[in-house]
Amino acid sequence: MLEQELFDQAHTLQSTLLSMLDYALAEKDPQRARLLADTAVQAGKIFDLSDYAVLSAPFQLAAAEQDGPKALELLDRLLRSLTVPWDLSASPLYPHLPTKDAAEESQRSLIPVLLDGTARDPDCAFLRAEPGWPELLARYQT
């Protein structure tokens, strides 16, 4: 089915852009990193991907730049996106693709993984020092 192929290719594109963003950050090329993050956002919106997919690159960039307020705001939006059901078939690009029944539960199961990873990652210490960190934890911990 063409819709499935488009959806799969859109996710492959997002993954490729995230990998390229990693390389740009490793090469200490902030201009290219920002361009790649912006491109990932635009591509995600054009291809009607989930908010989580659209916000991943800007969060990755903000975290790498250790921009605490921006990273915290984006992490909050990422986590919130995992609490909202995403109906893939509502997109005009994918009207015939069914939303899997277990998708919402699967999305929610990512929340503790993300919070735990962020809480343990030494590179995220700056984020845990942000004034809004305890409130974010309280909002999403179950």
Q: What residues fall within each predicted segment?
A:
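Alpha-helical protein-protein interaction modules
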Residues: 2-142
